[in-house]
Amino acid sequence: MSALTIFSVKDPQNSLWHSTNAEEIQQQLNAKGVRFERWQADRDLGAAPTAETVIAAYQHAIDKLVAEKGYQSWDVISLRADNPQKEALREKFLNEHTHGEDEVRFFVEGAGLFCLHIGDEVFQVLCEKNDLISVPAHTPHWFDMGSEPNFTAIRIFDNPEGWIAQFTGDDIASAYPRLA
């Protein structure tokens, strides 16, 4: 179940607000300029789908976003607990960073935790299957895939080069709850 928990940057252990209601989550995030929507990830992808299979299954969703925002490229990120690079990838994504473009993800399997550092608050968004999130360009954030990752998401970019991060050097992520 998708969830949003809001913390003060001054008190990372006690939440200010929490909800698992998709409409409430959407309202809170939209107020901060973050797009959050529930889409349908209802295609049968099989046991170990290739990136091509995932893209073909959800080309209609990609086309919708391209038509709306003019995105130029897309790919698929799929990580499982047996990935030999899972620890290195988790550490990389857990470092607060920004992008020069919106970070758009459509989760078609599993879950991951986006943590957005907006002003004096941190918004932890548990994204699961059916969730579309678009983090605005230049928003400091980090992503936690958990110690045993299990997710597949379509990533959509303005930049044809794909995922390019500018790390902030702030260790804020270490103070907040993580996925197990």
Swiss-Prot record:
GO MF term set: acireductone dioxygenase (Ni2+-requiring) activity; acireductone dioxygenase [iron(II)-requiring] activity; iron ion binding; nickel cation binding
Required cofactor names: Fe(2+); Mg(2+); Ni(2+); Mn(2+)
Domain of life: Bacteria
Outcome recorded upon mutating E96A: Loss of dioxygenase activity and decrease in expression of soluble protein
UniProt keyword annotations, A-Z: Amino-acid biosynthesis, Dioxygenase, Iron, Metal-binding, Methionine biosynthesis, Nickel, Oxidoreductase
EC number: 1.13.11.54, 1.13.11.53
Cofactor comment: Binds 1 Fe(2+) ion per monomer. Can be replaced by Mg(2+), but with lower activity.
Function of the protein: Catalyzes 2 different reactions between oxygen and the acireductone 1,2-dihydroxy-3-keto-5-methylthiopentene (DHK-MTPene) depending upon the metal bound in the active site. Fe-containing acireductone dioxygenase (Fe-ARD) produces formate and 2-keto-4-methylthiobutyrate (KMTB), the alpha-ketoacid precursor of methionine in the methionine recycle pathway. Ni-containing acireductone dioxygenase (Ni-ARD) produces methylthiopropionate, carbon monoxide and formate, and does not lie on the methionine recycle pathway.
Name this polypeptide is given: Acireductone dioxygenase
